[in-house]
Amino acid sequence: DVLKLFSNEYKNLYYTYVPVDTQYLSHKKLALTMGIKAARHDILLFTEADCRPIGPKWIKAMAGSYNPETDIILGFCAYRHTKGFLHKLIAYDNLTNGLQMISSALSHHPFTGNGRNLSYRKKLFFAHKGYARSLNLHAGADDLFINEVSNPANTQVQLSSDSIFKMNKVEDS
């Protein structure tokens, strides 16, 4: 009822429901699929709540990398510098994974992406039936999908300083 009331006032607010029989599916992939379906434009841009762009022109940098043949833009997300062995280990793992993703794509062998800084076309998502192959897996919304759909012709890397993100530190438990 509240959403209906708000949607009358805010014309850009959309809502839907999640059927009960989706309990064994990845909720993140289901939410992303619903958001992608509702998107009005073809170019989609993704990040995560614990990440922030370094500069103010992230959207312009990522969107500016598209040409007619490009369907995927891979961006980098660094781990925020913090003290402690755990954080250094996380930063190292993040850096090596990011370098592997970027170097593979730059050498015309793209195989993965990172949802913290990623863009792809809506039409690509639906042409490949979205997350259909991995909907029952709780991980892989970014890396498994990009592995399925990327190729040397449709994938670009954006590494300008405006396109780089930083991920906040993981909180110690």
What label would you give each PLM region?
Residues 21-30, 52, 138-139:
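A short, glycine-/small-residue-rich helix N-cap motif at loop->alpha-helix starts
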